Amino acid sequence: GAGTPGRKGVILSGFSGSTSIPPVHDNSDYKGYSSTIPIARFIDAILEPGKVINWNGKSVKLPPLKMCIFAGTNPFHRHQQINRIIEGWRKLETVIAIDNQWTSTCRFADIVLPATTQFERNDLDQYGNHSNRGIIAMKQVVPPQFEARNDFDIFRELCRRFNREEAFTEGLDEMGWLKRIWQEGVQQGKG
């Protein structure tokens, strides 16, 4: 899915400034709040905006969050304080879940966008660890079922609505990105 192969996809590139196209904002600290927060502390940002925490060797001021998009992840499954999640969830104005399973996150979301499974899209995956790593091509087996769309198309459409489609796609379609990431992997493997 979107963001899986490398760090460029962790945040929408059209908003994060991880491309050569100028971002909506410079991705530095915004109004004194940190531009990044540890995922395990996102509930703290919702419930205690402005709180300063120590993270990764530095002080981080948690930003106020009004909206969250969860793509292919289920915080209800991985977070240790479910009641605190529910409390924070109620404070958000909008929650969007993008997933191919009907998870707890989907059940609590305001909007659910159905994503394709690994059988319904072309993708790349990583295998191995440390000195024995590689990437493999995963070819689409069946067309997307019902209203499911692949992550790339979902995020491209979201970026289009914010006039950031070109920044997100960098002029490439889904297969163009897969080929580019594959070639980057081939070059790294030669290193």
Give, region by region, the residue ranges found by the protein language model:
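Short acidic (Asp/Glu) and glycine-rich catalytic loops that position anionic groups and cofactors
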Residues: 21-22, 64-65, 131-140
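Extended redox/cofactor-interaction regions of prokaryotic respiratory oxidoreductases
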Residues: 1-107, 117-124, 191
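N-terminal leader/propeptide and maturation segments of large enzyme subunits in energy/redox metabolism
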Residues: 69, 141-191
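Short beta-alpha connecting loops at secondary-structure transitions
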Residues: 119-123, 133-144
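Generic structural signal for well-ordered, non-membrane alpha-helical segments
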Residues: 61, 131, 135, 147-155
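Catalytic, metal-anchored helix/loop core of enzyme active sites in primary metabolism
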Residues: 110
